[in-house]
Regions:
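C-terminal motif of bacterial Sec signal peptides marking the signal peptidase cleavage site
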Residues: 15-19
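Extended ligand-binding regions for polar small-molecule ligands
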Residues: 21, 73-82, 141-142, 149-150, ...
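Extracytoplasmic small-molecule ligand-binding "clamshell" domains
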Residues: 28-111
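Periplasmic-binding protein-like
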Residues: 54, 130-137, 214, 218-253, ...
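Ligand-binding cleft/hinge of the Venus flytrap
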Residues: 76-83, 164-187
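Acidic, polar ligand-binding/catalytic clefts
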Residues: 77, 86-149
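Short helix-initiation/N-cap motifs at beta->coil->alpha
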Residues: 88-99, 143, 183-196, 232
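A ligand-binding cleft/hinge motif common to bilobed small-molecule-binding domains
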Residues: 96, 112-120, 169-171, 199-230
Length: 286
């Protein structure tokens, strides 16, 4: 089992569309460090406010003590430290994250968001990681799903909106065109809700990135039936023209060079993005 490192010295905010509540503030910006980002660049002076959807273990999730932990939380904390800022994590569903970063409620989206050219027209993106969509099923694979085409006639759950939902929707449309049995795409507010439905036998499978399906199969209740679907880069997200986007890209490039990022990815079994770590606003060159 991969080692999961919890975060320390970071504020966690649990947020919803109707409001939010804050955990105790136990953190401070690093000493002897001058931030490049000032009050005009941040939602809160001296703080890097980071939106994440903590329902995707081991990438980001809430542990038994109520702490938000995981690879992307570790990464967000390290980014904040290198920017001489205090990290504050806002745990909120993905559908609220892009409007929130656009309106300045938080500075950065760090939730495993897939890079798409359409999304890059809406917010600034910094690619850094690569993932593919997978299908998770109950242990024993009772529906004998082993290929994408085996999803015809099945009901697959997915968090929506998102890249995985778009992938399944496109697949359902292809099946319809080809005259195959319908793929029913059942949407959920969070990935955790989809897994609860899968555990209860309400759906045949659920769709999420490979690192998450691999984690869920560790306790023997689920297994990954299909992987490697629509592999693509993942990115941090920022408001258009945000100074923080350029600074985070700089820090991520620094992490790649000094070994922090490769070591973190190896620990969690994640594939690194091989292109330039830079602010992107349209189709990627690589």
């Amino acid at each position: 089992m991969r080692k999961i490192i919890g975060i320390a010295a970071a504020t966690v905010v649990v947020a919803g569309l109707a409001g939010c509540s804050s955990a105790a503030d136990e953190s401070a910006a690093p000493a002897n460090c001058t931030p490049v980002l000032g009050a005009a660049d941040l939602a809160e002076e001296g703080t890097l406010t980071i939106a994440t959807n903590a329902t995707l273990p081991p990438m980001q999730y809430v542990d038994a003590d109520g702490e938000v932990i995981g690879m992307r939380v570790d990464l967000g904390k390290e980014i904040a430290e290198r920017l001489c800022l205090r990290p504050k994590f806002v745990n909120i569903e993905f559908e609220a994250q892009i409007p929130g970063v656009q309106s300045g409620r938080w500075d950065m989206i760090d939730t495993g968001m897939f890079y798409t050219p359409e999304r890059a027209e809406t917010i600034d993106l910094v690619p850094y990681e690569v993932q593919a969509v997978s299908i998770s099923v109950p242990a024993g694979n009772p529906e004998s799903i082993s290929t994408v085409d085996d999803l015809a006639g099945k009901t697959i759950g997915v968090e929506a909106p998102g890249y995985e939902f778009d992938t399944l929707t496109a697949l359902a449309e292809r099946f319809a065109t080809e005259g195959k049995p319908a793929l029913t795409v059942q949407t959920f507010k969070t990935n955790a809700d989809a897994y609860q439905a899968l555990s209860a036998g309400q759906i045949d499978g659920t769709s999420i990135v490979e690192s998450v399906t691999s984690f869920y199969q560790q306790d023997g209740r689920f297994e990954t039936a299909v992987g490697g679907i629509n592999e693509a880069p993942l990115a941090m997200g920022f408001a258009k023209g945000s100074k923080s986007a350029a600074e985070v890209a700089r820090v991520l490039s620094e992490m790649r060079g000094d070994g922090y990022l490769p070591d973190l990815f190896e620990q969690y079994g994640v594939t690194a993005y091989e292109g330039d770590i830079a602010v992107s606003t349209g189709p990627l060159d690589s």
